[in-house]
Amino acid sequence: MSPAAPSQRDRSVPAKAGAGARRTALAAALALALATASPQAFPQTPATRDALLAQARQQHGTGHRLEALAACEDLLRRWPADADALRLRVRLLAELGAAVRALELARQLPTPLPAPELARLEADAAAHQARWAQAMPADTRHPYVEADRALASPDPAAVDDAIAAADRMIALARASRSREAAGAYQALRRRGGTLPAYADTPVADALLQQRQPEQAIPLYEAASRAQPGPYPEEEADPRIGLAHAYLEAGRHRDAQQWIDRVAASEPAWLPAPGSVRPRANPHKTEAELTAALVRQQTWRYREAWRRLEALRAEGPANASIWNQLADTERARGWPRRAEDTLVGAAGLDPDDTSIRLGAIDTWRELGDFPRVEPALREVEAVVPRDPQVQLARQAWDRQRGWQFDLEHDRGRGGSPNFGDADHETQATLQSPLLGERWRIYGITRLAAANLPEGHTQRERLGLGLRGYARGFEAYVQALPAVGNQTRRTALEAGLRWLPDDYWTYTLDWSNTGDADVPLRAHYYDITAHSLNVSAQWRASERSAIKLSANADRYSDGNRRHGWEAAWTQRAYTAPWFSVDGGLQAGATSNSRSDVPYYSPSCARWIAATGRLENMLYERYERSWSHQLDLSFGSYDECRYGSGWMASAHYGQRWAPHAGLAFGWGIGWNSQPYDGKRDNRVMLDLTLHWGE
């Protein structure tokens, strides 16, 4: 079982800037109001220019910027052209957050500011404008316009000023131009410069967006030490970003320990001024969501789901909780439930990009392909720079593009069906999606075995058509014989239907029965019409029950019927490690046993099964995992009695990047056939390219 693809919040985006942003705007307005206050507000205002300037500088030096600005404005009312007061006013406005107004006044100074100081003002103004554009864009359909306009000023990188460079990095990060922000940070480091403390978090966000968690971690750690909290509601919490960086760097234990401490330290409720009812602490909620995400990304889906269900019960009006709950439900194999949850999330926040991306992922999983492209284009039209949007586009293009699969199995032993040595290869090349519902594909099958009677091989090459609908998949294919040892054209068809999140039904039919007819029967030109059906009930990733049945009508008159039932149950889960146990039982019967291939008149078996799976390495789409499958039981054949049977298989899977995966495995099987024990060793290789 592979973990679900990560669904991580864009760390460059601060918390919703609703009431907090309005308070910031109110503070700025108050600053300007105090700056223009009448001199009566300060009854001991000095009468001379030098005294007023000295008072302004003294207030500035002690950190009383509003009072300093009021004194400065009083001086300028009397001496409007005073150069020192004009320059001090620019500096005070910039420090109070009125960066745009400060820049306007700086450009009106009779004596221009030095280039480094002007560059710093330009970068500061750009950072403020980008922040406002990110939190409250004037046009939600074009959220980058204001930020890009703010960044259109000359690049201050040529000026050796760390403050100006840092402000521009902040503006770039908030304008969703994280690549440029990360590049500017690397250039600053090469020059031997350091970031001011206030820039650590936004620059770390940009580095994390560019998948450089090792570079982001020191900045997040420095920001967390410099300001351990509490944080304003509209300000991003660097401790949350640090947990994301730990997780993306593969340090999942550090991520869990850190975020659990953060969540425990945050109060659930904050006092609400003017109200007796407290308000929810958004940073507490975000920490709890991140704690659930850490568990989800390390395969502990049930624990994550339970945490999110509890959070939703406490905060049913929080769209972020609904959204992440849907992501966890999809990871547990419940896409329809996830879709319903996303509808609720969209009702709470219809403009949230991640909610729309979650719906797109759900439709892709359900095979509801016609809805994917229009929805994705609509999102791209608004936020094309969003890293999660870009990843969604790449994943969809891979899924709807060319697909190639190669499987090769090789075995050695003394089986009556397989001979001393056998091998089978199947390769499939599927076209891109046609009309969002169809694929045409080419398929080849090559199988051969060294039997006591001699060498035999079965070779086919053909075409197929596969169709998709919501929760439904069907195929039909024709594989003419190749070579002089294969007879007839194989016609095959099948379907797979998922009516809900729990049941899966499959049906496969073939007029040659290549999957069921052993190569020993093929040596004697025997084929079969075969029908295989199955029904599976899967509660979640933790348990499933499957019942399958087959009916084969051989060309030599033999009739074979069989069934098999399998139950699997999760026994243990740890980070990137799982243990499953189960039981398997089945039976088969044949109308003829006087045939040249293994055909018992009746046989029954029961076995205990186990599977251990472990992720050895994971970094974004790159992963390396291994798996061990074991089974042991009893095989009872009519007229020959019972004997033990066992099998073991060890395999690894390596995905060097998204859309490409290699697999290999080695297995061993021991089972009695007609009272004689057969031991067989197998090697299997797989390759997948596409999605």
Functional labels for PLM-detected ranges:
Residues 36-38:
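N-terminal signal peptide c-region/cleavage motif recognized by signal peptidases
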Residues 45-48, 54-55, 59, 88-108, ...:
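Gram-negative and organellar
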Residues 26-34:
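Hydrophobic helical h-region of N-terminal Sec-dependent signal peptides
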Residues 23-24, 90:
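Hydrophobic alpha-helical segments, especially transmembrane helices
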Residues 1-20:
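N-terminal secretory signal peptides that target proteins for export/translocation
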Residues 64-97:
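N-terminal, post-signal-peptide region of Sec/Tat-exported proteins
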